[in-house]
């Protein structure tokens, strides 16, 4: 008896997920494999990918355009949370996994499949993100992960595929492992496994080298409504267009590269290179607008929530009770995070140089040091006395021994 009757396979068109098709059928006795390729803005032509799955033995090959849903329902909430794993990684890849898992589960329901499958290995974070998300959405659905069990090298995987008519890659395989979507790119493996080695320029695609960036700065005004990006330079834009345009404009000036040692969920450290020009600028701009519109106590408390939120998403707990609770808090804080942030792009930098909001809590007459100052300086003495009282009591007791 096979491990499943009918399987929905998350499909990218690469060697591993292509080999999963005959492997599931011939090694694990799956009677029917239906592939699902999800368009998240990775730039691949999806019709050739769909045909490739059919040629590899899939009984049906599905394609889902999920770009708008990806940005609106996954990226924008993460921007509202200022989500940066370990204060650096904006979760560009991690955010895609719960959406793909959701679409897999929906396809399984629609086509009556008793299992879903993915091509993740046993070493990365994505296997956790897929398996846990699928379990949260449908705990009765089996999850199959052939690449986690088959134990084949890259060469053996290619040879196995050739037995079933899956052609070997035409060009020499890149030494890098690359994942891409509309939010950015992640690059790892190959020469990058040496943490001392500077990445070659060939690894980058979305961001220009500094020496090739414009010699004049560019300004972009980003409009937000309730914490959600809605416009560039006063032009209302749909989510996909907004992120796409910002990627191009920011990347042209060389901003958006991350080179970090990252703590994976499975317990190992890995060297990761990321490109996320638009996403990083949106997070920076959003955080700055919050500094203008949130009270100090809410803003400071939210920073701790953001760290927990980022860790949950990175660790595959998008669909979890704690994540839902954090979502509720974050949404409450965003009601007045509305306004415009001006960002200056120049030679690998993206700096906020202006911000305005109809809900601004900044009061010039209180902040100024000029003649129009309305702050009551006489009130400071009493405040300082009360504020410093615990410290004075502590110091007195310390002197008394």
From Swiss-Prot:
Per its UniProt entry, what is the enzyme's top EC class, as one word? ligase
Q: What is its EC number?
A: 6.3.4.5
Residues recorded as binding L-citrulline, renumbered to this chain, are 89, 125, 129, 177, 186, 262, 274
Q: Name one GO cellular component term.
A: cytoplasm
Q: Name one GO biological process term.
A: argininosuccinate metabolic process
Drop me one GO molecular function for this one: argininosuccinate synthase activity
Alphabetically list the UniProt keywords. Amino-acid biosynthesis, Arginine biosynthesis, ATP-binding, Cytoplasm, Ligase, Nucleotide-binding
Residues that bind ATP, according to the entry? 10-18, 119
InterPro entries for the chain? Arginosuc_syn_C (IPR048268), Arginosuc_syn_N (IPR048267), Arginosuc_synth (IPR001518), Arginosuc_synth_CS (IPR018223), Arginosuc_synth_type_1_subfam (IPR023434), AS_cat/multimer_dom_body (IPR024074), Rossmann-like_a/b/a_fold (IPR014729)
Q: What is its main location?
A: cytoplasm
Protein name, per record: Argininosuccinate synthase
Organism, as annotated: Thermosynechococcus vestitus (strain NIES-2133 / IAM M-273 / BP-1)
């Amino acid at each position: 008896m096979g491990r499943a009757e009918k399987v929905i396979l998350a499909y990218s068109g690469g060697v591993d997920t292509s080999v999963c098709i005959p492997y599931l059928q011939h090694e694990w006795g799956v009677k029917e494999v239906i592939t699902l390729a999800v368009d998240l803005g990775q730039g691949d032509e999806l019709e050739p990918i769909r045909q490739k799955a059919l040629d590899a033995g899939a009984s049906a090959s599905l394609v889902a355009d999920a770009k708008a849903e990806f940005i609106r329902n996954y990226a924008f909430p993460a921007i509202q949370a200022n989500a940066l794993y370990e204060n650096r990684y904006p979760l560009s890849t991690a955010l895609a996994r719960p959406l793909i898992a959701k679409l897999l589960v929906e396809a399984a329901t629609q086509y009556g499949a008793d299992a879903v499958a993915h091509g993740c290995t046993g070493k990365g974070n994505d296997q956790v993100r897929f398996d846990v998300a699928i379990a949260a959405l449908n705990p009765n659905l089996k999850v199959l992960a052939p690449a986690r069990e088959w134990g084949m090298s890259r060469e053996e995987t290619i040879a196995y595929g050739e037995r079933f008519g899956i052609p070997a890659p035409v060009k020499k395989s890149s030494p890098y492992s690359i994942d891409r979507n509309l939010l950015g790119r992640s690059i790892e493996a190959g020469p990058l496994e040496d943490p001392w080695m500077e990445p070659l320029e060939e690894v980058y695609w979305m961001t220009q080298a500094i020496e090739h960036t414009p010699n004049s700065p560019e300004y972009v005004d980003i409009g937000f409504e309730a914490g959600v990006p809605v416009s560039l330079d006063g032009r209302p834009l749909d989510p996909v267009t907004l992120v796409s345009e910002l990627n191009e404009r920011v990347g042209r000036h060389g901003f958006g590269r991350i080179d970090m040692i990252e703590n994976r969920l499975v317990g190992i450290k890995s060297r990761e290179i990321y490109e996320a020009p638009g996403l990083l600028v949106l997070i920076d701009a959003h955080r700055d607008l919050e500094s203008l519109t949130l009270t100090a106590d809410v803003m400071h408390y939210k920073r701790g929530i953001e760290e927990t939120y980022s860790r949950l998403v990175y660790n595959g707990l998008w669909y979890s009770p704690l994540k839902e609770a954090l979502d509720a808090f974050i949404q409450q804080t965003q009601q007045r995070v509305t306004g415009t942030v001006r960002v200056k792009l120049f030679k690998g930098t993206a700096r906020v140089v202006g911000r305005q909001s109809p809900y601004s809590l900044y009061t010039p007459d209180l902040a100024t040091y000029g003649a129009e100052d309305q702050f009551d300086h006489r009130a400071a003495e009493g405040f300082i006395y009360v504020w410093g009282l615990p410290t004075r009591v502590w110091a007195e007791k310390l002197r008394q021994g």
